Amino acid sequence: MTFGDIQFLWARGIVETLLQAGVRCFVVSPGSRSTPLVLALATTRDIVVHKILDERSAGFFAVGYAKATGQTVCLVCTSGSAPAHYLPAIVEAAHSFTPLLVLSADRPPELHGNAAPQSVNQAHLFPSFSRLFVDLGIPESGDAALRAVTRKVTQAAVAARLPEPGPVHINVPFREPLEPSAIGITSPRPAVAAAPQFVAPRSALLDTETVKS
């Protein structure tokens, strides 16, 4: 198993855990560093994925979708300035008690503090507005590590709904290689523990096409 396979397995575990918690809508602004997350979404059933290239537009689309359906919506982006563009939507979600998750890819620790491109301190980007910040750390091999990360993701999904709905930020750093091997991408879905679900009727999911900017 390559390190790219390990990261892809983690990304799939994250997505599967969110799905178990009732998160079915993902709004993606793709970039290189978020490759494991985007591939995980592409290989997961029973979710709705919207691609919006501009993060500011994506943020407000997600807030509107969450308000219209009552569902938690998950924003997914790459590293650097990308998650910072969500700030106006985060403020809106915080003050309107709208359940919203931000799942940001990040550069690994060794690329921070030495002028590497698209490497900024993504910890606590929204300290005044997010209900919770969770950093998942560099992906590791092994069932115990995967169980630990799924527990943190479950905690984040719950925090977006309770005690009062609002935005939650999940940050996950990835190292290169970002792509899994041919064997890794066809590996079985990771088993994740059942999580508390906050699911509206499936009919509440908006029937909209992928949005592009």
Locations of regions flagged by a protein language model:
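N-terminal alpha/beta PP-like core and its mobile active-site loop of ThDP/TPP-dependent enzymes
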Residues: 1-213
